[in-house]
Amino acid sequence: MSSEYGALRSLDSPNVGSYKLSKVALNGLTRLMASAVDNNQIKVNSADPGWVHTDMGGPSAPRSPEQAAEGIVWLATLPDNGPGGKFFYDKKVIDW
């Protein structure tokens, strides 16, 4: 699981710096792994579930766990010709 904070554009602000850097590293690892398994019927992608109403996200978070899970399950069940090495939010590719 990644986050919008894993996008390089998020580094313009120092807020939650260590969290952002961990997500940037995760996104980098996603790209490396996707390249390593290319053409092996393995899909490696990164997903941002959004701000989710969980213990970590808190009661103000607008998304339910079920809403967040939709995109994650979709990625986990991509067909063989589905995308790999991408960053997704709500089943849409977003910029790294």
Predicted regions and their residues:
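C-terminal helical subdomain
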Residues: 39, 46-49, 54, 58-96
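Catalytic loop of short-chain dehydrogenase/reductase
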Residues: 1-39
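Structural signature of the Rossmann-like NAD(P)-dependent dehydrogenase/reductase core
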Residues: 1-3, 43-48
